[in-house]
Swiss-Prot record:
It comes from Macrococcus caseolyticus (strain JCSC5402). HAMAP family: Ribosomal_bL20 (MF_00382). GO terms for molecular function: rRNA binding; structural constituent of ribosome. It holds the Pfam family Ribosomal_L20. Binds directly to 23S ribosomal RNA and is necessary for the in vitro assembly process of the 50S ribosomal subunit. It is not involved in the protein synthesizing functions of that subunit. NCBIfam families: rplT_bact. Keywords: Ribonucleoprotein, Ribosomal protein, RNA-binding, rRNA-binding. Belongs to the bacterial ribosomal protein bL20 family. InterPro entries: Ribosomal_bL20 (IPR005813), RIBOSOMAL_L20_CS (IPR049946), Ribosomal_protein_bL20_C (IPR035566). This is Large ribosomal subunit protein bL20. It comes from the Bacteria.
């Protein structure tokens, strides 16, 4: 019985890995062994960063809201507490967009939050 080496299967698997490594620097996009290691590491980075992206955006929204709130003489934490007490349910993403794009609407929200805290 002749030995079966699986040439087409091996070639297809290696070709797939090299295709995933497209755009990598140096030998990482040409040599199979190095490309395989880098593709695995890239997958780990992608998995980790999909979770970190959510944290980073939340931090960005909070920083924007805080900067806009302090222009109206109120801190971020007091603003958020005031909005909660006033019964205004708006998430941080939308609040940061309002702070950037519609200054008058944000000022009105700040006034309502201040009134609810008194």
């Amino acid at each position: 019985m002749p030995r079966v080496k699986g040439g087409t299967v091996t070639r297809a698997r290696r070709k797939k890995t090299i295709k995933l490594a497209k755009g990598y620097f140096g030998s990482k996009h040409t040599l199979y062994k190095v490309a395989k290691q880098q593709v695995m590491k890239s997958g780990q980075y992608a998995y980790r960063d999909r979770r970190q992206k959510k944290r980073e955006f939340r931090k960005l929204w909070i920083a924007r809201i805080n900067a806009a709130a302090r222009q109206h003489d109120i801190s971020y934490s007091r603003l958020m507490n005031g909005l909660k007490v006033a019964g205004i349910d708006v998430n941080r993403k939308m609040l940061s967009e309002i702070a950037i794009s519609d200054e008058k609407a944000f000022a009105e929200l700040v006034n309502q939050a201040k009134a609810a805290l008194k």
